[in-house]
């Protein structure tokens, strides 16, 4: 019977574990790429250091309700996933604790929610938390992220548009309603004139 080689066995185990780790990392990189594609090239990176687990979980739920997602990941994997975008020129984003915010419907709504949360959590120091990101696969600075958060959301824009579209219809309805009322008043005035003239 052959003697058991502990070192060879240990090496095979390390090699198998290493392959599993590499596969897992590649799966994460692919999932980040899929999220970016699903979000039509929208992602914002922010520093989550100092945010307790419970508030971060609540933020994640709020973002999920707005059809978005927050992912906490390793900078090397984020960089690998986004290295084929303009973010490859902005490696400074991938330094320190990093979370990614994806929006699958309304980027403005999820950005507003993130900025609101950061303001509540960090008061005056919130601005340094935003690292930048992508909008339609184009790089956006932290300042542009703040400007994005100040835009009206999709729902607000739809409400304003409906108001603009409904104004002429409402005016027409009021005009049409006023015509019979004015006619009645004119007829009443004629009737009063005749009754005065007849006496």
Curated annotation (Swiss-Prot):
Which molecular function terms from Gene Ontology are attached? large ribosomal subunit rRNA binding; structural constituent of ribosome
The name under which this protein is listed is Large ribosomal subunit protein uL10
Q: Name one Pfam family in it.
A: Ribosomal_L10
Q: State the InterPro entries in the record.
A: Ribosomal_uL10 (IPR001790), Ribosomal_uL10-like_sf (IPR043141), Ribosomal_uL10_bac (IPR022973), Ribosomal_uL10_bac_type (IPR047865), Ribosomal_uL10_CS_bac (IPR002363)
Function comment: Forms part of the ribosomal stalk, playing a central role in the interaction of the ribosome with GTP-bound translation factors.
Q: Does the keyword NADP apply?
A: no
Question: In the UniProt record, does the keyword Ribonucleoprotein occur?
Answer: yes
What keywords tag this UniProt record? Answer: Ribonucleoprotein, Ribosomal protein, RNA-binding, rRNA-binding
Q: Which CDD domains match?
A: Ribosomal_L10 (cd05797)
Q: Which GO terms describe its biological process?
A: translation
Q: Which NCBIfam families match?
A: PRK00099.1-1 (NF000955)
What does the annotation say about its assembly with partners?
Part of the ribosomal stalk of the 50S ribosomal subunit. The N-terminus interacts with L11 and the large rRNA to form the base of the stalk. The C-terminus forms an elongated spine to which L12 dimers bind in a sequential fashion forming a multimeric L10(L12)X complex.
Name a GO CC annotation attached to this entry. cytosolic large ribosomal subunit
Sequence similarity:
Belongs to the universal ribosomal protein uL10 family.
